[in-house]
Amino acid sequence: MTVSSSIVPPGGLVLVTGVTGFIGSYIANGLLELGYRVRGTVRSSEKATWVTKALTKRNPSANFEAVIVPDQNAPGVWEAVLKDVDGIAHVAGDVSFGPDPTKVITPSVEALRRLLEAAKKEPSVKRFVFTSSDQAASNRSTTREILINEDTWNEEAIEAAWRPPPYEAERGWDVYSALKAQVEKEMWRFSREEKPSFVVNSVLPTYTIGAIFDEQQAGSTAKWLLDFYKDPSKDGFMRGFGSSYYVYVGDVALLHIGALTLEEVQNKRLLAFAGRFNFNSWLEVFRKHDPSKPWPEDDPTQALDTRRVNGETELYILKQFGKDGWTSFEDSALKVLESP
């Protein structure tokens, strides 16, 4: 793909919310490498400083601007931020895993609505992409075969999240899943009913891995895996997480960039499901890479995720950026070890 064939013009300006996050930083870096300008939202001046330094170090001649947005629900917060923006990647989200849906889901839906309403008023905006999650489509399963497509929604999590109080801590995962589903649903409702001039798409990443972009980052899913590699005796979280699909963070970034820029990618839910894994899959890769470490034995109780997807559009997008398919599981896992 060349920038000249993009919906966003050469040197065009893309807003990336949550640019300091694991996925957000990779999206911003990929856009800068392609010659786009990037405006990224952060919550504090400290975060603005380190993310600007990290991105400009990799792209010395790039045009990156950090904008402080401490509260996405503040009235009028988006108007100035969106000035002259060609595309929006809305990556920022609540990752507190809080159990109270009124404190997690309700303000997140409102924040998205405010951003979309402001974007509708900005004539330069051509594309809007929301970073959703596989959990917006369905819970993980090792017993039921579930076909995931653009019409699949995690109604099970939504129902569980909104059960009456008390809001027990164990509800946090259902609330997170419902959050992603309900915010994404609101984006599609807005597009359908409000009919903005811009095209909307969403990207649904699964368990995302790769090198943490900067040492200042929490690292998200990659950090969990890195901690296990550094100390194999602390295997409780990765063992307990069990099975899902993985995806390399660089591939997730390319799907976002394709959703922002490719003419033919319109009104799509892009399913970033590269391949299945379970706890034993990590062990196989890490034993091969460093057999000297005291890796635990394989867990015979570990099954594999039984969800299925059809990833034709996703593979097409990767091909436009010169990639012949998803980054392999082994390569993706080993990239985590390149983290600062």
From Swiss-Prot:
Q: Which keywords belong to this entry?
A: Glycoprotein, Membrane, Oxidoreductase, Transmembrane, Transmembrane helix
From the record, what ranges are coiled-coil? Answer: none
Induction is noted as: Expression is under the control of the terrein cluster-specific transcription factor terR.
Q: What is its EC number?
A: 1.1.1.-
- Return the broad EC class: oxidoreductase
Q: Which residues are glycosylated?
A: 139
Q: What happens when the gene is disrupted?
A: Reduces, but does not abolish, the production of terrein.
Specify the protein's topology with respect to the membrane. Single-pass membrane protein
Tell me the compartments it is located in: Membrane
Which family does the record claim for this protein?
Belongs to the NAD(P)-dependent epimerase/dehydratase family. Dihydroflavonol-4-reductase subfamily.
This chain belongs to which protein, by name? NAD-dependent epimerase/dehydratase terH
